[in-house]
Amino acid sequence: MAKKILYQDNARKALEKGMDTLVEAVAITLGPKGRNVVLERKFGAPQIINDGVTIAKEIELQDLAENTGVALIRQAASKTNDVAGDGTTTATVLAHAIVKQGLKNVAAGANPITLKKGIQKAVKFVVGKIAEYSKPICSMQDVTHIGSISSGNDVEVGTMIANAIQQVGKEGIISLEEGQSTSTELDIKEGMKFDKGFISPYFVTDTSRMEVIQDNPYILITDKKITLIQQELLPILEKVTKTGRPLLIIAEDIEKEALATIIVNKLRGIINVVAVRAPGFGDRRKLLLEDIAILTSGVVITQDMGLSLDSMSLDQLGSARRVQITKDSTTIVADAQKDLIQARCDQIRRQLEAATNSYAKDKLHERLAKLSGGVAVVKVGAATETEMRDKKLRLEDAINATKAAIEEGIVPGGGSTFVHLSEVLRVWAINNLVEEELVGALIIVDSLLHPLKRIVENAGNNGSIIIEKIKNSNFSTGYNADIGQIVDMYKEGIIDPAKVTRSALQNAASIASMILTTECLIAEQVDN
């Protein structure tokens, strides 16, 4: 297909036009009085949402040159969402403001490369100041405030997230599920859970609930496929039978004949046994089995270590306080040795620092949560499917924002941190930068005012007047758009995670700098 090539101002203008379209759709959701956006669906009900990154992902323009502008600014939102999980609308508004100011200067003859250097220096300075001013989270009340604000001022959600974090710890997993009722509920799963259930329904002990419950069982952990019951399993089964305790077998798989023999012994009441397949695949399976072994104080019977099933002893079996197995999942509640668990968690944290792709990071986070804290499940309740989707997105933002706040602390919310730091940046830039680098830094000074301005305008007031009032007050002062008053943000609980504030600015400036230094745009030529 033929290509359309645009140069200089024409290229930048096309990108700007696309950005204008996207930003207007996203910015109307900003702040406590931000409005909703309805997404039309070819199949199923329309979706009503208030989530910046989801709206940004939906927008596709007919003009492919303008659509490139949409795609670029969408990156600022997506990257912020990946890093901090919230602040996507703020990142979009900031990126747009930087591009708008920057393009005016480029059109007036400024050198985009020097402007970019000024922008980068200014952002580095502001990020340092955000870290300096951020306060660590001191109480569960702070966690509640963060959760409430990020979920659209829903105190009930904030309290629920605070309770979940208190139960599972900051490294625990909080997952979202669609509930069956109209109210949102919190369910805490104790112990380690993995997504493999019993191999055969003949193992079930509670037929009404179709599950297996074992108290104080031994646990045999192996990465082998069990094929020969006489040679491989019989010796250890006899030893376990003498103790009178139940046995859980976690293996790669069990051959039909071996499985049949185990089931017959179970049904005759000779031994209380249940078999499940090992979780995961390949190398990850071995790591998960090692995690289970550490949790249950057992040993993984593997050829790599020179261990075999026929020669194993009771000491090599793990043990647990309680095991609950359904057809889809296994939950092990064990009294593990704290020092061994801590060492394993530290090892996983080091792997997390070195991990590059998001899939590997997610899986490591999952392992860390299972070992260290446990899992909290929030069952989202709503009257309609449309409300359910909106609630899920808000809850997702709230959970991410809360975790970000625990990591890097909190700063005054509602865009007020940016307003206060814009004045600090102005003084620093005038004293430390010259010529076009100074112009680049002053672009950031002006752009930092835009998130608050938009929040105020969405609440139906004059942004410029409020900004002037906040500039002349102390750092914790900001604007409560909900009641339309200037207040102490910490006292009112209007706080943002420092990580979200920082990421929004860094990603916005990164994308905006790239757009400003664009001199040529190549896009598909669309025939009318």
Curated annotation (Swiss-Prot):
<keyword id="KW-0143">Chaperone</keyword>
<keyword id="KW-0934">Plastid</keyword>
<dbReference type="GO" id="GO:0009507">
    <property type="term" value="C:chloroplast"/>
</dbReference>
<dbReference type="GO" id="GO:0051082">
    <property type="term" value="F:unfolded protein binding"/>
</dbReference>
<dbReference type="GO" id="GO:0042026">
    <property type="term" value="P:protein refolding"/>
</dbReference>
<feature type="binding site">
    <location>
        <begin position="86"/>
        <end position="90"/>
    </location>
    <ligand>
        <name>ATP</name>
    </ligand>
</feature>
<feature type="binding site">
    <location>
        <position position="414"/>
    </location>
    <ligand>
        <name>ATP</name>
    </ligand>
</feature>
<dbReference type="GO" id="GO:0016853">
    <property type="term" value="F:isomerase activity"/>
</dbReference>
<dbReference type="InterPro" id="IPR001844">
    <property type="entry name" value="Cpn60/GroEL"/>
</dbReference>
<keyword id="KW-0150">Chloroplast</keyword>
<dbReference type="Pfam" id="PF00118">
    <property type="entry name" value="Cpn60_TCP1"/>
</dbReference>
<protein>
    <recommendedName>
        <fullName>Chaperonin GroEL, chloroplastic</fullName>
        <ecNumber>5.6.1.7</ecNumber>
    </recommendedName>
</protein>
<dbReference type="InterPro" id="IPR018370">
    <property type="entry name" value="Chaperonin_Cpn60_CS"/>
</dbReference>
<dbReference type="InterPro" id="IPR002423">
    <property type="entry name" value="Cpn60/GroEL/TCP-1"/>
</dbReference>
<comment type="similarity">
    <text>Belongs to the chaperonin (HSP60) family.</text>
</comment>
<dbReference type="InterPro" id="IPR027410">
    <property type="entry name" value="TCP-1-like_intermed_sf"/>
</dbReference>
<keyword id="KW-0547">Nucleotide-binding</keyword>
<dbReference type="GO" id="GO:0140662">
    <property type="term" value="F:ATP-dependent protein folding chaperone"/>
</dbReference>
<comment type="function">
    <text>Together with its co-chaperonin GroES, plays an essential role in assisting protein folding. The GroEL-GroES system forms a nano-cage that allows encapsulation of the non-native substrate proteins and provides a physical environment optimized to promote and accelerate protein folding.</text>
</comment>
<feature type="binding site">
    <location>
        <position position="496"/>
    </location>
    <ligand>
        <name>ATP</name>
    </ligand>
</feature>
<keyword id="KW-0067">ATP-binding</keyword>
<feature type="binding site">
    <location>
        <begin position="29"/>
        <end position="32"/>
    </location>
    <ligand>
        <name>ATP</name>
    </ligand>
</feature>
<keyword id="KW-0413">Isomerase</keyword>
<dbReference type="InterPro" id="IPR027409">
    <property type="entry name" value="GroEL-like_apical_dom_sf"/>
</dbReference>
<comment type="subunit">
    <text>Forms a cylinder of 14 subunits composed of two heptameric rings stacked back-to-back. Interacts with the co-chaperonin GroES.</text>
</comment>
<dbReference type="GO" id="GO:0005524">
    <property type="term" value="F:ATP binding"/>
</dbReference>
<dbReference type="InterPro" id="IPR027413">
    <property type="entry name" value="GROEL-like_equatorial_sf"/>
</dbReference>
